[in-house]
Design a protein with these regions (language model features):
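Conserved acetyl-CoA-binding loop-helix of GNAT-fold acetyltransferases
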Residues: 80, 86-99, 122, 126
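Short coil/turn motifs at secondary-structure junctions
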Residues: 65-67, 83, 116, 142
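Acetyl-CoA-dependent GNAT
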Residues: 2-70, 76, 94-95, 100, ...
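Hydrophobic adenine-recognition pocket in adenosine-nucleotide-binding enzymes
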Residues: 78-80, 113
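Conserved active-site alpha-helix within GNAT-family acetyltransferase domains
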Residues: 91, 115-133, 138-139
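Conserved GNAT acetyl-CoA-binding A-motif
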Residues: 101-113
Length: 142
C-alpha cells in the first residue's frame, strides 16, 4: 500500500469517495466533482492505494489552520475500506498526517472519533493521541 496526496479531482477518485463515505457515515451526502476539487485545492487529501491494483482503499484529510493561539492541525474523514480494515491502512494514513503536522510545526494535531469506533480509538491512543477533557459542540445550520 502507498499513500499519496491527491492533486486533482478525478472521476476515479470521486467514485472511491462515493464508495467510502457511506462506510464512515451513511447520512452524509458525497461530494460532487467540483466539491472534491475544492477539498483538494484547499486541504490535503491523502489517498491510500493498493500496491497491486492501484485502487483506492482509504482516505484521510489533513487540515492546517491558523488561529490567534497559533497553527493547529486536524485530521478529518479517515475512512478505510471494510475489505482492508485491520491491515494498517488507517495507521499509515494517520501517521502521514502526524508527519505533516510535525513538518508544519503545529501546536497540536486534533481529531475526533465516535466512541463506538473502538478499533479507531485504540489506534489513536496507541499513536499517542490523548483524549481532551472537553466537550465538543456542533451546530448545524438549517
Amino acid at each position: 500500500m502507498r499513500v499519496e496526496q491527491a492533486s486533482e479531482a478525478t472521476e476515479e477518485l470521486l467514485d472511491a469517495i462515493h464508495r467510502l463515505l457511506p462506510q464512515l457515515n451513511a447520512a452524509r451526502t458525497p461530494p460532487t466533482l467540483a466539491q472534491l476539487g475544492e477539498v483538494i485545492d484547499t486541504q490535503t487529501l491523502l489517498v491510500a492505494r493498493d500496491d497491486e491494483t492501484g485502487g483506492v482503499v482509504g482516505v484521510a484529510t489533513f487540515v492546517l489552520y491558523r488561529v490567534a493561539s497559533g497553527l493547529k492541525g486536524r485530521v478529518e474523514d479517515v475512512i478505510v475500506d471494510t475489505s482492508v480494515r485491520g491491515q494498517g491502512v488507517g495507521e499509515t494514513l494517520v501517521r502521514e498526517c502526524m508527519a505533516r503536522a510535525n513538518e508544519a510545526q503545529v501546536l497540536m494535531l486534533e481529531l475526533t472519533s465516535m466512541p463506538y469506533r473502538e478499533s479507531a480509538n485504540r489506534l489513536y491512543k496507541r499513536l499517542g493521541f490523548v483524549r481532551k477533557p472537553t466537550n465538543v459542540y456542533v451546530w448545524w445550520p438549517r
